[in-house]
Amino acid sequence: MRFMHRAESRDNMLVKSYLLLPMILSAFERDSTILSTHLRTPAPYLEVLGTAAAVATTDLRDVRSEMRKRGIKVYEQNRLNTGIEAKFICRGYHERMLLLNDIVAAQAAIHMRRYLGLDISSFKSYEEQYQIK
């Protein structure tokens, strides 16, 4: 096993999306089930959630395709008390990523808002927040 390589920023973003998008899709599905049983007229809400889930599904497909093109494969995911650990191969090198629960929740909420068509302009990117160039 080779471990000295560090995945590029784009590679890390792909892996992060690969981990987050299935959770977002599960949340949309769970919310659809809850809304369909607790609202008198759930159809409009379910339509919005369905549209959001369809876009997220397309994004996940695109992420997987891009990962294949770039030689990235997640081979292990573990749910830890602190977050989600992923082990992946990036162009022949073994990498590890840990997403803390707070980060996962915050990022998932921002992505969900975007998929639902809500304004996310008040949320700064990591680069903007820490003034990274």
Predicted regions and their residues:
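Long, hydrophobic N-terminal alpha-helical segment
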Residues: 1-41
